[in-house]
Swiss-Prot record:
Protein name: Methionyl-tRNA formyltransferase
Source species of the chain: Phenylobacterium zucineum (strain HLK1)
Residue sites binding (6S)-5,6,7,8-tetrahydrofolate per the record: S109, L110, L111, P112
MF terms (GO), sorted A to Z: methionyl-tRNA formyltransferase activity
Keywords tagged on the record: Protein biosynthesis, Transferase
Family: Belongs to the Fmt family.
Length: 308
């Protein structure tokens, strides 16, 4: 089929790659404009943009797909279908309906649970045991369209947003290729989403990232893993030179009791409002990520230290 692909982050690259490998004609890739990245804050193309250029696929990076000129250019592509994976813009009806067979989205949750921007993080933070990825027909409503296909994924006890991201990206890439084949053959079945059980995965705000040790231990643990590696749940560690910000990147709940926010041993077991959390991987401000053992070799944290 002749397709357009609209996507931006790493999550979308594997889907684009497998669509190309499956032999579909990708007429154009749309991605968010180049943004400052890295320590030098240089303008760099998105991961999807970079991949498309490496394969010689034309790329457009409009500031808004609502621009009448962009809508007309999209229509002029003469598409069979459009595939959208974490593009980063809400698409107008004129764009969604331009392809002959419609526009289809790969979404990283089991709809109608976790419609919105941050389904991977919210699923972990909420303690969901199972999530997944689905292909749906796009409508003007936010992630409200009928579902064509589903792949379920269990959330492991030490799952982080990074590990779940990679598993769902792989599942979604395979699923969209299978679903496009069904659409082309006229065999795709569309199932309306349930009206009950709707939840929204709001965008992660910076103020959410600070750890509140007074919350129950399981909740603190899920927050740490759900925000790892970005933006990273963080706390302040007192030092002789003043407080230092430390990100907690991996943790595990333990059935131990002690004052909330206080280290209960010399191996980064921290008391919470209920139970305790063992920090397994951390990142001190200005340094790279480290396993707890390596971190403690350079920064002693004895029992009784109050984290804030």
């Amino acid at each position: 089929m002749r397709l357009a692909f609209l996507g931006t982050p790493d999550f979308a690259v594997q889907a684009l790659a497998e669509i190309v490998e499956a032999g579909h004609e990708v007429a154009c890739v749309y991605s968010q404009p180049p943004a400052p990245r890295g320590r030098g804050h240089e303008l760099r193309p998105s991961p999807v943009h970079a991949y498309a250029e490496s394969r010689g696929i034309p790329v457009r990076t409009p500031a808004s797909m609502r621009d009448p000129a962009e809508i007309e250019a999209f229509r002029a592509l003469g598409l069979d279908a459009a595939v959208v994976v974490a593009f980063g813009q809400i698409l107008p009806r004129e764009v969604l309906e331009a392809p002959r067979l419609g526009s289809f989205n790969v979404h990283a949750s089991l709809l109608p649970r976790w419609r919105g921007a941050a389904p991977i993080q919210r699923a972990i933070m909420a303690g969901d045991a199972v999530t997944g990825v689905q292909v749906m027909r796009m409508t003007e409503g936010l992630d409200e369209g009928p579902v064509l296909s589903t792949a379920t994924v269990r959330i492991d006890a030490l799952e982080t947003a990074a590990t779940l991201h990679d598993r769902l990206a792989a599942a979604g890439a395979g699923l969209i290729v299978e679903t496009l084949a069904q659409i082309a053959a006229g065999r795709a079945v569309e199932t309306p989403q349930a009206e009950a059980g709707v939840t929204y995965a709001k965008k992660i705000r910076p103020k959410e990232a600070r750890i509140d040790w007074t919350r129950p231990g399981p909740e603190v643990d899920r927050k740490i893993r759900g925000l790892s590696p970005f933006p990273g749940a963080w706390f302040e560690l007192p030092t002789e030179k003043g407080p230092v910000r430390v990100k907690a990147l991996l943790s595990a709940f333990e059935d131990a009791e002690g004052p909330a926010g206080e280290t209960l041993d010399d191996r980064l077991l921290v008391g919470t409002g209920h139970g305790a959390v063992r920090l397994l991987r951390v990142q001190r401000e200005g340094r790279g990520p480290q396993d707890a053992e390596a971190f403690l070799r350079g920064t002693a944290v004895p029992a009784g230290v109050k984290l804030s």
